[in-house]
């Protein structure tokens, strides 16, 4: 919310720029960075100010982190600007875990293959180095985000590094490794490991598996997705991810006709509405 309590849509581009430029109110700056990304404001001025915000040291969280840097990093991933890639790579060395995580995800959105060496550095030491930190809600590195981004970037050089994380003691790390390896190798064996998450006793893990399968577009998982004990809204999102991936792989003529797989997917989606 802005200072006046107006909804997001009521903030203008000019107000967002002014709020991000000033330094007296950190809350307004934080919100402005989010707003610029949320509404895809790709003007050079907005991008330049968001890049500048990646070095902000005025807005500090109780945990010592940098909230404005986090929002700026997230926003830049949505703005399709190559200028943001080098500054985001630099953010991978920030002491704030959440800045590293946001930068990692944005580099994936930007398809920044040049970031692969820096991303691999975050996984140095293997599974043993990615561990819990006493008193913190996160691990030493955002390994799940790193592996997912490596998968997005089709960084096949990362395969042996990521394979080691299939044996990590934390479920979400193993799931991220399997998702990444399917994207990197196309081997169904890895996708089936993600499918197993649909029957996990914990709802959050089932939700994660749904989102992962939608992201990788693993078509054989469609029936299991539809039957998963989770919200229909999430199952629909996952199935739409499968359908989108399937259609991208078809010729325009095939899309016009709709093959059996596409029709079956749409039938499953109709059943969830």
Swiss-Prot record:
CpcE and CpcF associate to form a lyase. Belongs to the CpcE/RpcE/PecE family. The keyword Aminoacyl-tRNA synthetase does not apply. Keywords: Antenna complex, Lyase, Phycobilisome. Its EC number is 4.-.-.-. SUPFAM superfamilies: ARM repeat. InterPro entries: ARM-like (IPR011989), ARM-type_fold (IPR016024), PBS_lyase_HEAT (IPR004155). This is Phycocyanobilin lyase subunit alpha. Pfam families: HEAT_2 (PF13646), HEAT_PBS (PF03130). GO terms for molecular function: lyase activity; oxidoreductase activity. Required for the chromophorylation of the cpcA gene product. It comes from Synechococcus elongatus (strain ATCC 33912 / PCC 7942 / FACHB-805). GO terms for cellular component: phycobilisome.
């Amino acid at each position: 919310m802005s200072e006046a309590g107006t909804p997001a849509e009521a903030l203008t581009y000019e107000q967002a720029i002014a709020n991000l430029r000033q330094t007296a109110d950190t809350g307004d700056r934080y919100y402005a960075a989010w707003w610029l990304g949320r509404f895809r404001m790709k003007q050079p001025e907005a991008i330049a100010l968001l890049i500048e915000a990646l070095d902000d040291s005025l807005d500090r969280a109780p945990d010592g982190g940098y909230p404005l840097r986090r929002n700026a990093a997230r926003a830049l991933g949505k703005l399709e600007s190559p200028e943001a890639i080098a500054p985001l790579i630099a953010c991978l060395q920030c002491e704030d875990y959440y800045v590293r995580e946001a930068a990692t995800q944005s580099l994936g959105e930007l398809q920044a293959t040049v970031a692969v060496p820096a991303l691999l550095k975050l996984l140095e030491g293997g599974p043993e180095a990615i561990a819990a930190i006493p008193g913190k809600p996160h691990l030493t590195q955002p390994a799940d985000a790193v592996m997912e981004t490596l998968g997005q970037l089709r960084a096949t050089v990362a395969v042996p590094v990521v394979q080691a994380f299939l044996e990590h003691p934390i479920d979400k790390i193993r799931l991220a490794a399997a998702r990444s390896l399917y994207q990197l190798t196309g081997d169904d064996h890895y996708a089936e490991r993600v499918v197993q998450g649909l029957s996990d006793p914990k709802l959050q893990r089932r939700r994660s598996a749904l989102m992962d399968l939608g992201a990788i577009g693993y078509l054989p998982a469609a029936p299991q997705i539809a039957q998963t004990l989770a919200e229909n809204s999430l199952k629909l999102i996952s199935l739409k991810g499968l359908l989108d991936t399937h259609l991208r792989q078809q010729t325009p003529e095939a899309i016009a006709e709709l093959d059996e797989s596409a029709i079956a997917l749409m039938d499953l989606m109709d059943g969830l509405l």
